[in-house]
């Protein structure tokens, strides 16, 4: 959440000449609702199942950059599938930077659950994120993150 996955993903895809896909955006388009509305109307479990279905569509594709939501990247099954299909990058964001970036964003249902919940959620997700092939500190501008990533490819 709020690490810059979509922005960095688009920039990276442009640099590589690949196609960019944002799983959250695809889900919203297909459902005709925002993620917040999906959570409210059908629940988090339904949304997480949609994430996995959409991810499965990209596992066999080549020359794509895929941005996942933070919850999908924290799913151990999804992480293993992504790692076997391609390179997985973790944009690591410290909690204070996360709060600054997310403070004014609408449509993020998990942000409404309070600071203690968010801190615990980030700590729990990091256990799976650490399995990514590459870890980049996400406290720099998006173009600097892309250059840093390209230097590691």
Where are these predicted regions, by residue range?
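Short glycine-rich anion-binding loops that position phosphate/pyrophosphate groups of nucleotides
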Residues: 70-72, 94-96, 141
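ATP-dependent small-molecule kinase phosphotransfer cores
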Residues: 23-71, 75-83, 128
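Walker A/P-loop
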Residues: 6
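NTP-dependent small-molecule kinase module
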Residues: 11, 15, 61, 124-153
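A glycine- and Lys/Arg-enriched "phosphate-lid" helix/loop adjacent to the NTP-binding pocket
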Residues: 85-127
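Walker A (P-loop) phosphate-binding loop of P-loop NTPases
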Residues: 2
């Amino acid at each position: 959440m709020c690490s810059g996955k979509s922005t960095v993903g688009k920039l990276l895809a442009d640099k590589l000449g690949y196609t960019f896909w944002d799983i959250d955006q695809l889900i919203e388009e297909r459902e005709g609702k925002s993620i917040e509305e999906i959570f409210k109307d059908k629940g988090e479990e339904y949304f997480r199942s949609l994430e996995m279905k959409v991810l499965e569509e990209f596992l066999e594709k080549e020359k794509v950059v895929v941005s996942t939501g933070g919850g999908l990247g924290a799913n151990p099954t999804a992480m293993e599938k992504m790692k076997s299909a391609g390179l997985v990058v973790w944009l690591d964001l410290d909690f204070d930077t996360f709060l600054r970036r997310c403070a004014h964003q609408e449509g993020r249902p998990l942000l409404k659950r309070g600071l203690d919940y968010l801190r615990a959620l980030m700590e729990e997700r990091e256990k799976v994120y650490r399995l990514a092939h590459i870890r980049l500190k996400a406290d720099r501008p998006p173009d600097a993150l892309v250059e840093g990533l390209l230097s590691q490819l």
